[in-house]
């Protein structure tokens, strides 16, 4: 009788394990994919180059008052924003970023996500901040930058299309330029 009980429990645990794999397959696939995409390290040289690209771009966009919203993905993945955007997957260059944000371009609205030296997504919708005491002159782009930075560790750069001012947002705090 113990042999039968042992066999039933062994079989049941096998079927439960297989059932769990089938039921949670999409989540497991996404989790394994995310583990495979974790950057082990980014060299200081690569970081400097990426920052330089973003600085060049936002300065040029600010000069001609073209609005921009750029999030640099760090350790917290920007999954919700990514799912709302369009996959771009190209090298992050000033020319490419300027092309994306050029007015009337099909993907100029929303934010861009940069991971490493790649533009991964464009036309992303970032969550708006719920802070009630923000300056009423801040537009949607700035509110989206603050909102995303409240939920993630991504530094975000904003160019105002009204004033050409460049702002930096990190962990819910904005520094206006």
Task: Please tell me what each predicted stretch does.
Residues 10-14:
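Residue-level signature of transmembrane alpha-helical entry/exit and packing/kink sites
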Residues 4-6, 16-19, 24-25, 29-177:
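Divalent-cation
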